[in-house]
Amino acid sequence: MANNLILLGLPGAGKGTQAEFIVKDYPTVHISTGDIFRANLANDTSLGKQAREYMDAGNLVPDEITNAMVADRLNQDDVQANGFMLDGYPRNEAQAEFLDHYLAENNSAVSATLYFEVSDSLLRERLLGRGRADDTPEVIDNRLEVNKAANLPLVDYYKRAGVLHTIDGGRELAEVYHDVKAVLDNL
């Protein structure tokens, strides 16, 4: 069975960087929720049209629409053959439960959840170092707090499920990836 991975961590924890390393060494499909949304919006799909209505009104897209977009992507041949690595989904426990049920219906499951743990001070330093105009200390602190509120229940959820692997993301890239490989090589 192909491995199905979830990457969790606060902004600046290194999820995207580690995902780039993982896809070079392991046959898995990196799926970013942002990419799924952009594809549905660009292709003007039924789900994309529904999502656009919420987004244009300045509202969050409901879980049902996000879940349906993710399910459509997970149903594609490349994912069926190689498994997936989700980045940016699930964002809450209801989405995690949907994903578990969806996978179970398709005789599959989450193989591992990699949680990249990094201190707040290092996250701030990394995010400020990106040089984005909107990355002020106040905006960054708010983003970290909002993301903590979403991430921590998911960390607990996957810990209870027995698939959580906490990785110290505050070290050199090669050291972090060494720990990632140790997890993936034992799946």
Curated annotation (Swiss-Prot):
Pathway(s) it belongs to: Purine metabolism; AMP biosynthesis via salvage pathway; AMP from ADP: step 1/1
SUPFAM superfamilies membership: P-loop containing nucleoside triphosphate hydrolases
GO molecular function: adenylate kinase activity; ATP binding
Subcellular location: Cytoplasm
Enzyme class, first EC level, given as a word: transferase
NMP: annotated segments: 32-61
Binding site for ATP: G12, A13, G14, K15, G16, T17, R130, R171
Region (LID): 129-135
Subcellular location, principal: cytoplasm
Keywords: ATP-binding, Cytoplasm, Kinase, Nucleotide biosynthesis, Nucleotide-binding, Transferase
PROSITE patterns linked to this entry: ADENYLATE_KINASE (PS00113)
Binding site for AMP: T33, R38, N59, L60, V61, G88, Y89, P90, R91, Q95, R132, R143
Domain of life: Bacteria
Alphabetical GO biological process terms: AMP salvage
GO cellular component, one term: cytoplasm
Keyword flag ATP-binding: yes
Record EC number: 2.7.4.3
Catalytic activity: AMP + ATP = 2 ADP
Family: Belongs to the adenylate kinase family.
Function: Catalyzes the reversible transfer of the terminal phosphate group between ATP and AMP. Plays an important role in cellular energy homeostasis and in adenine nucleotide metabolism.
Subunit organization: Monomer.
Comment field on protein domains: Consists of three domains, a large central CORE domain and two small peripheral domains, NMPbind and LID, which undergo movements during catalysis. The LID domain closes over the site of phosphoryl transfer upon ATP binding. Assembling and dissambling the active center during each catalytic cycle provides an effective means to prevent ATP hydrolysis.
HAMAP family from the UniProt entry: Adenylate_kinase_Adk
Entry protein name: Adenylate kinase
Species annotation: Leuconostoc citreum (strain KM20)
